[in-house]
Regions:
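Beta1/beta-strand and adjacent pyrophosphate-binding region of the FAD-binding site
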Residues: 1-13
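Core beta-strand elements of the Rossmann-like FAD/NAD(P) dinucleotide-binding domain
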Residues: 3, 201-210
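Gly/Ala-rich phosphate-binding loop of Rossmann-like dinucleotide-binding domains
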Residues: 18, 22, 169
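Glycine-rich FAD pyrophosphate-binding loop
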Residues: 22-42
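Active-site substrate-recognition segment that forms the wall
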Residues: 31, 79-85, 181, 205-206, ...
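Helix-loop-beta segment of a Rossmann-like dinucleotide-binding subdomain
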Residues: 133-171, 194-196, 206, 287-296
Length: 315
C-alpha cells in the first residue's frame, strides 16, 4: 500500500496531523519510535490556556487563536479538558500596593476576557485579601493585598494524545509505536517516496507521497536523513517543573506568579485530586532555558530547582 501521508512522531502534533489527514479521506500512516506522548507531550504543565502572558508581549492575535482552540478542545474532549480557576496575587512591597501594577493586572484581565476568555462561560473578578488567602493559606498574609481570579483549563496531556491517536485510527489511519525511521527513500529524480522503518526486528519499506516531520526536538535528525547533513535548525529549550507534596502549599486552585524581569510567569498548579477535595501534588513551573544535553534523557539540575525556588520563595 502507498500512503498519501506518512507522519513521523507520535506526540500531540503528530497525532493531530494524522487525525486531520485521515478525517479528510487521505490514506495516512503514523510511526513513533518510542511510545505515544513519550516526549514533550507527557511533560507539560497539564494546562490548556490562552497564554495570558503573551498579552504582555502584545501578541493579541496569538491569544485569540489559543483561546479559540481551548474552547474547541473543551467541546471535543470534555472528559479530559476541565475548567481550572487561576489566581494572580496582588502583592505589597513594604506594606504598600503598587496601584500601577494593580491597574495593569485589571486591564490584562479584561483584555483576556474580551479576546476570548469569556467563551469558558465565566469572567474574571477581583478577590479581597481574605478570599485570596483561603486559596493559598501558606502564603505570608502580610504580603497579600488582594488578587484577581480568572479561568482557563487543565488536561491530562498523555491521555489527550492517546485519545487523538485512537480517533485517527478510527478514521482509518495506520498508527504504530515502537517503530523507528532509519532512512528516507527517494526516487532517482530526488522525489521523496517514503521511509525505511524498523519495528520488531523487521525492516519495512513504507511508501508515501508526502512525509510530515513531527518529531519534535528530534526533527533535525529526520531532516538529516533527507538532506544528508544535520541542519541544526532546532534550538532545544528545557522547561522544568518541580513537584512538591500538596500539603506544603495547600492551594486549591492554580496560582500565577509573574516574573517581571523575564516577561513570563510561573504556574503553581494542584494535581491529583482526592475524594476529600485535597490534592496529591503541586506542580511549580516552568523554567525556560537553552539546553544542549542529551535529548533522549534530559535531566533536572540543582540550578533548575534553585531558579524555581527563587521565584516562589516569597509565596
Amino acid at each position: 500500500e502507498t500512503f498519501d501521508v506518512l507522519v513521523i512522531g507520535g506526540g500531540i502534533t503528530g497525532v493531530g496531523v494524522a487525525l486531520d489527514a485521515a478525517s479528510r479521506g487521505l490514506r495516512t500512516a503514523l510511526v513513533e519510535r518510542d511510545d505515544f506522548a513519550s516526549g514533550t507531550s507527557s511533560k507539560s504543565s497539564k494546562l490548556v490556556h490562552g497564554g495570558l502572558r503573551y498579552l504582555q508581549q502584545g501578541e493579541v492575535n496569538l491569544v485569540y487563536q489559543a483561546l479559540h482552540e481551548r474552547q474547541r478542545l473543551r467541546r471535543n474532549a470534555p472528559h479530559l479538558v476541565k475548567v481550572l480557576p487561576f489566581m494572580i496575587p496582588v502583592l505589597t512591597k513594604d506594606g504598600v500596593v503598587s496601584r500601577k501594577v494593580a491597574r495593569a493586572l485589571g486591564s490584562a484581565m479584561w483584555m483576556y476576557d474580551l479576546t476570548g476568555g469569556w467563551r469558558i462561560g465565566r469572567f474574571h473578578r477581583r478577590l479581597r485579601k481574605q478570599q485570596a488567602f483561603t486559596h493559598l493559606p501558606t502564603m505570608p498574609a502580610e504580603r497579600l493585598a488582594s488578587a484577581y481570579l480568572y479561568y482557563d483549563a487543565r488536561v491530562d496531556d498523555a491521555r489527550l494524545v492517546l485519545t487523538v491517536a485512537r480517533t485517527a485510527a478510527a478514521h482509518g489511519a495506520a498508527v504504530v509505536n515502537r517503530a523507528t525511521v532509519t532512512a528516507i527513500t527517494k526516487s532517482p529524480d530526488g522525489t521523496v517516496q517514503g521511509a525505511v522503518v524498523e519495528a520488531d526486528g523487521r525492516r519495512i519499506d513504507v511508501r508515501a507521497r508526502c512525509i510530515v516531520n513531527a518529531a519534535g526536538v528530534w526533527a533535525d535528525d529526520i531532516r538529516a536523513m533527507d538532506e544528508g547533513r544535520h541542519p541544526d535548525s532546532i534550538r532545544p529549550a528545557k522547561g522544568v517543573h518541580i513537584t512538591v507534596p500538596w500539603e506544603k502549599v495547600r492551594n486549591d486552585i492554580a496560582v500565577v506568579i509573574p516574573v517581571p524581569k523575564d516577561k513570563r510567569s510561573l504556574f503553581v498548579v494542584p494535581w491529583g485530586p482526592k475524594p476529600d477535595g485535597t490534592f496529591r501534588f503541586t506542580f511549580v513551573g516552568t523554567t525556560d532555558t537553552d539546553y544542549d544535553g542529551p535529548l533522549d534523557d534530559p535531566q533536572c539540575t540543582k540550578a533548575d530547582i534553585d531558579r524555581s525556588e527563587e521565584h516562589t520563595s516569597e509565596l
